[in-house]
Amino acid sequence: MVDFKTYDNKEFSLESNEGNVGILLSGGLDSLLLLTLLCEYFDRQRYIIFTIDKPDGSMMWTEKILDYISDRFPTNEFYQQIIEGGDTDEKAELGISGKVGFSDVLRNYYSNLGILYSGNTANPPVALDHNTAEPDRSAALKAQEKWEKFTMPF
């Protein structure tokens, strides 16, 4: 386990796993940072990268991220799974409501993972002028409570 402290004194930790390490890679900065930190501190891991195909086009960045990470950390293994379903809402039998793609990861891949990371971040402590609405993290927070191996370190 590696412990970190941010510039504003928030603490988080990351841990390796003997099994597969799952990561929800959106193509954004948060999940890129998470994957980079994991690879920097934990060598010779097998990473299962889950990218949910959403209509916002963010998936195009995940290929570039994986090319960069694979070159920089060649002793790790990377396997990408493109998950269909995008932003469609679903109330699944999993006990949480959320997006179809995320439900698919929990339903079909979770049991083969030692840990599943998400780069979701907490909402900003202050409202920003350009935001139209606060991001809704409730489904991910409920999943973190319900699914023992699912974690959002940020």
Language-model regions: role of each:
Residues M1-F154:
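ATP-dependent adenylation/nucleotidyltransferase module used to activate substrates
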